[in-house]
Each structure stands twice: as structure tokens, then as C-alpha cells.
Amino acid sequence: MLLSLVYINCDYLQAQTTIPRFEEGERVVFVGNSITHGGHYHSFIWLYYMTRFPDKPITIMNAGIGGESAWDMKDRLDYDVFNRKPTYVTLTFGMNDTGYDIYMKDNAKELSEQRIAKSLESYREIEERLLAKNKIKTVSYTHLTLPTKLEV
């Protein structure tokens, strides 16, 4: 009985969650760091669409660069993202933003706070610039949560 209720409840929740699909001709740019650059998730998304909707081709573009931070991505939005004329943009950042490489330095707390502030400023500017582009229908962000209080 309990399993039946769980199944019914999950089925109900699944029916309530509809993820819109990309339509024919959509242009999706995946922006990020090495996780995007070397990852294969964008290829899996393309393969999913090509095998299920072969009559509605989409374009998937990888704009990931290893070692990038949010401020690097912000600086290349015009020539590496907007020039591709995307209808969707997804961003993955955060791994290189918080200063994991500076924790052993004497002034680690100060350096980390500076990098966190720079990252937050970059996130805001990226958001503003993407939202100003009316032709980009959806903007998706994925980033690591920054600490609200830094303990070193």
C-alpha cells in the first residue's frame, strides 16, 4: 500500500514538472571553465535531441575554457558568446573563483575576501548583460555557493 502511494505521488509530481524542450533552430551556448570544456554533458544533450527529434535540429556550442573564473567569462561574453547568436545560454562557474589556491598564504583571508567580492561583482555583471539581450530566451546559472563568512 505504501509503495503504491509513493508511486502515485511521484507520478503526480512528474506530471507537474514540464521542462520545455529546445525547438528547431535553437542555438545553445554552454559557457564555463574546465568542467564545461572537458565535460561531455552538452554532447549528451545534443545526442538526446538528435535521436528523439531528428527533424528539429539544434546547435550546441561549447564555450568552456579550463581555468576560467567568472571575471574571465564576463570579459569574453561579446566575442565568445554573443557573437554565436545564442537563443539559450547556460553558465557553469565557481570552481576557480574562490581562491582555493591561496589558502596556504599568510594573507589568505584577505585574498579570499577580495576574490569573493570580485566574483560576486562579475556574477552580477554577467546577469545584467545576459538579461539585456532580448533574443536570449533563457539564462541558466550554475555556480558554487560562496561562503557568507570566511573562516581561515
PLM feature segments, named:
Residues F82, L131-A132:
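Residue-level signal for alpha-helix termini/capping positions
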Residues M1-Q16:
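Bacterial Sec-dependent N-terminal signal peptides
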Residues K133-K137:
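A short helix->loop->beta-strand "cap" motif at the edges of active sites that frequently abuts
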Residues T142-T148:
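Conserved small/polar residues in nucleotide/adenosyl-binding loops
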Residues T17-R124:
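Conserved SGNH/GDSL esterase-like catalytic core that processes O-acyl groups on lipids
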Residues T90-T92, T138-Y141:
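Short beta-strand segments at enzyme active-site cores
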